[in-house]
């Protein structure tokens, strides 16, 4: 949109004839144009945070009589009034104008008197150091010259030949307009530049002009660090993104789509700006089960004990493929073995899965491998639920694998063999709760349980790769010592499981502090009372007749009633008082001179 062209921009002149026939010419010129301003608004704080137009406009006046300059000799008073005009055409209003309170757009001091200065050239100057604009836009200033005559000969021909006392009237003589300047909003305001040489020159001659000796411009170009103020101008698009449609779109149809609708600034529409979500328990469980499935796909080590069982190695990858798919609860669903597999191979798959579950380190956030196994598998014996400790799990695994190994295989030394027999015998009367356990129990009825050390060897890397987590104190149970020497049929009474699976009763040994080598703890606290160490008579007894606490009891080193001259100290004995109130004496050894 182009600016409105005016004829009297920057320069203007007017000529008039006096009563005696002389021609007076007035030449007005804007020698310092306004360039920028910051909109101060019309709120309550507009007057407090108001920025003047920069640089301050300066208008020069010269008065001529018949081509002879008489600026300093002309006897008259001049003042210049500034008004604000739009530099561009204003579109007609879209809404009917309401008669409401309207504030003047131009604020400050719009009137300036003439100052006779010698520099830059001898002339009269009008300076406007305090002009502000309320609203942003493109404006220009219009300066109107008014004259107050002091002599009758300078009056106009139609004026009466009288000069009123007190100068009651002025006459409009000339008008000049400034160049268009821009009023910015507070966020887009580029700042103030250093005061011009003309402003300094005027200020040196006594005029009140604000002088800035440093540049207060916002460095928006060639600046590496993008701050919030420059983010809008340097292509960051913060204001551009959250800005709504411009007023030009108000005239469109209600249902017409906006072509350049700004994108929402919400972090939900941009995944990169959204805060990261913490992984849930199920997601961590899937990743943990997938890593274990990868460990099971490794070929088992070649040991001479299981060299005669090729069916175990052939069914192991098949079992891993069944459990690699992510499921919410892999422990709750039994594997679906093929119908052509032998019972021994099916049982070996289940035993390897259960033995690997024993060797895995506890992960509290995982529901399959954490401490919640007591609710998920209430029918398992304590030896399977106990490997919640980092270093106690391998001996348990070795014991279980050695106790249930085939008699013809090589077996490692174990603590006792009775728990294995009791477990086998007591596994029949226990009622299963899970399909997984029911599947395992049906296999145990037909054949004895065979646990292979290969499953422990394959799960050992996962036990070392994952860091052990600190066990929860509330769910921590003491390891059960293998003291089950009762007949095989009494195992079901020692380890009882409720029908609802909510409460479990384990035969745990009672904690004895004497066997652990811990010092006995008394029921009461060992903290000494105040009166056993310090004199508390002044606290418990009455203080009458100006009495004060007397620290002259036994054990105190100072006695106010004793004479100033004390007895010589016995160097053979050293007496002191302990914190518990007891008096102690120690022999001081003689040091040879």
UniProtKB/Swiss-Prot annotation:
Pfam families assigned to the protein according to its UniProt record, in alphabetical order: Velvet (PF11754)
Localization in the cell: Nucleus; Cytoplasm
GO process terms (BP): sporulation resulting in formation of a cellular spore
Skewed-composition ranges (Low complexity): 310-326, 341-360, 367-389, 450-465
Short motif Nuclear localization signal, span: 35-40
Keyword Nucleus set for record: yes
Biased composition range(s): Polar residues: 1-16, 413-429, 440-449, 482-505, 512-534
Region (PEST): 443-487
Span of domain Velvet: 21-212
Any one Gene Ontology cellular component term annotated for this protein: nucleus
Keywords from the UniProt entry: Cytoplasm, Nucleus, Sporulation, Transcription, Transcription regulation
Recorded phenotype for the gene knockout or disruption: Leads to hypersensitivity to oxidative stress, compromised reproductive development, repression of asexual sporulation, and reduction of virulence during maize infection.
Bias (Pro residues): 327-340
Region described as Disordered: 1-21, 218-569
Keyword Ubl conjugation belongs to the record: no
Family: Belongs to the velvet family. VeA subfamily.
Role played: Component of the velvet transcription factor complex that controls sexual/asexual developmental ratio in response to light, promoting sexual development in the darkness while stimulating asexual sporulation under illumination. The velvet complex acts as a global regulator for secondary metabolite gene expression. Controls the expression of the T-toxin gene cluster. Promotes oxidative stress tolerance and acts as a virulence factors during infection. Negatively regulate mycelial pigmentation and controls sexual development, as well as asexual development during vegetative growth.
Domain notes: The C-terminal PEST domain is a region rich in proline, glutamic acid, serine and threonine residues that is required for the light-dependent regulation of development and secondary metabolism.
Subunit description: Component of the heterotrimeric velvet complex composed of LAE1, VEL1 and VEL2; VEL1 acting as a bridging protein between LAE1 and VEL2.
Name of the featured protein: Developmental and secondary metabolism regulator VEL1
Organism: Cochliobolus heterostrophus (strain C5 / ATCC 48332 / race O) (Southern corn leaf blight fungus)
């Amino acid at each position: 949109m182009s600016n409105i062209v005016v004829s009297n921009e920057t320069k203007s002149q007017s000529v008039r004839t006096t009563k005696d026939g002389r021609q007076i010419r007035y030449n007005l010129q804007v020698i310092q144009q306004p360039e920028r301003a910051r909109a101060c608004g019309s709120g309550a704080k507009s007057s407090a945070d108001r920025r003047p137009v920069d640089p301050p406009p300066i208008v020069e006046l010269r008065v001529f009589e018949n081509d002879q300059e008489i600026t300093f000799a002309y006897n008259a008073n001049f003042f210049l009034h500034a008004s604000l005009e739009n530099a561009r055409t204003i579109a007609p209003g879209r809404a009917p104008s309401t008669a409401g309170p309207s504030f003047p757009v131009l604020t400050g001091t719009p009137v300036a008197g003439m100052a006779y200065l010698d520099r830059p050239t001898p002339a009269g100057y009008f300076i406007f150091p305090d002009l502000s604009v309320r609203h942003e836009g493109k404006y220009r200033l219009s300066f109107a010259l008014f004259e107050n005559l002091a002599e009758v000969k300078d009056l106009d021909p139609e004026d009466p030949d009288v000069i009123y006392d007190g100068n009651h009237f002025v006459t409009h003589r000339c008008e000049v307009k400034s160049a268009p300047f821009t009023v910015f909003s507070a966020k887009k305001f580029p700042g103030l530049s250093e005061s011009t040489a003309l402003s300094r020159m005027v200020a040196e001659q006594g005029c009140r002009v604000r002088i800035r000796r440093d540049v207060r411009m916002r460095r928006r170009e060639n600046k590496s660090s993008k701050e919030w103020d420059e983010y809008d101008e340097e292509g960051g698009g913060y204001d551009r993104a959250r800005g709504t449609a411009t007023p030009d779109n108000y005239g469109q149809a209600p249902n017409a789509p906006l072509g350049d609708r700004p994108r929402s600034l919400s972090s939900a529409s941009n995944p990169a700006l959204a805060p990261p979500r913490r992984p849930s328990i199920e997601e961590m469980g899937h990743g943990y089960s997938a890593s274990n499935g990868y460990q099971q796909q490794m070929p088992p080590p070649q040991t001479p004990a299981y060299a005669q069982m090729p069916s175990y190695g052939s069914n192991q990858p098949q079992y891993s493929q069944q459990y690699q798919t992510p499921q919410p609860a892999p422990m709750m669903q039994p594997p679906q073995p093929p119908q052509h597999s032998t019972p021994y191979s099916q049982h070996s798959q289940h035993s390897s899965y259960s033995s690997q579950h024993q060797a895995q380190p506890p992960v509290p956030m995982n529901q399959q491998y954490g401490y919640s196994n007591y609710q998920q598998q209430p029918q398992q014996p304590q030896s399977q639920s106990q490997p919640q400790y980092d270093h106690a799990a391998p001996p348990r695994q070795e014991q279980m694998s050695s106790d249930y190994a085939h008699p013809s295989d090589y077996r490692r030394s174990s603590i006792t063999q009775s728990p294995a027999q009791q477990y086998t015998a007591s596994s029949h009367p226990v009622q299963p709760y899970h399909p997984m356990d029911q599947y395992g129990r049906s296999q145990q009825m037909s054949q004895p349980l065979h646990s292979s050390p290969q499953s422990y060897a394959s799960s050992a890397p996962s036990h070392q790769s994952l860091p052990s987590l600190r066990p929860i104190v509330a769910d921590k149970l003491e390891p059960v010592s293998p003291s089950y020497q009762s007949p095989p049929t009494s195992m079901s009474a020692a380890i009882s499981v409720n029908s609802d699976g909510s409460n479990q009763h384990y035969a745990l040994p009672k904690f004895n502090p004497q066997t652990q080598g811990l010092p006995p703890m008394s029921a009461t606290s060992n903290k000494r009372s105040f009166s056993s160490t310090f004199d508390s008579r002044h606290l418990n007894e009455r203080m009458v007749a100006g009495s004060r606490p007397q620290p002259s009891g036994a054990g105190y080193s100072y006695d106010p009633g004793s004479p100033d001259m004390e007895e010589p100290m016995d160097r053979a004995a050293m007496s002191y008082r302990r914190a518990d109130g007891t008096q102690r004496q120690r022999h001081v050894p003689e040091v040879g001179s």
